[in-house]
UniProtKB/Swiss-Prot annotation:
Domain of life: Bacteria
The keyword Ribosomal protein appears for this protein: yes
Source lineage: Bacteria, Pseudomonadati, Acidobacteriota, Terriglobia, Terriglobales
PROSITE patterns xref list: RIBOSOMAL_S16 (PS00732)
GO cellular component, one term: cytoplasm
Gene3D superfamilies reported for this sequence: 3.30.1320.10
Species whose genome carries this gene: Acidobacterium capsulatum (strain ATCC 51196 / DSM 11244 / BCRC 80197 / JCM 7670 / NBRC 15755 / NCIMB 13165 / 161)
The encoding gene: rpsP
Protein name per Swiss-Prot or TrEMBL: Small ribosomal subunit protein bS16
Length: 82
């Protein structure tokens, strides 16, 4: 099963995260299929960048989002089309 979840990056005590598409049984920072965004909790407010089209593609293919990623996607709605 494929998951969309966070992969920790950054130095000790200075984390930032990549939002990755990865096989569920892989290690947290294992080889990912695709990077679909970033999340930096250290900025104020926390910065989130999402590739919505790719997230929609992978969820359409059956990928499950982790609880935290689902919350980040929900808190950061897509911009309205012009």
């Amino acid at each position: 099963m494929v998951m969309i979840r966070l992969a920790r990056m950054g130095a000790r005590k200075q984390p930032y995260y990549r939002i990755v598409v990865i096989e569920k049984r892989s290690a947290r920072n294992g080889r990912s299929l695709e990077v679909v965004g970033t999340y930096n909790p250290r900025t104020n407010p926390a910065s989130v960048e999402l590739k919505r089209d790719r997230i929609d593609y992978w969820t359409g293919k059956g990928a499950q989002m982790s609880d935290r990623v689902a919350k980040l996607v929900q808190q950061n709605p897509a911009p309205a089309a012009a």
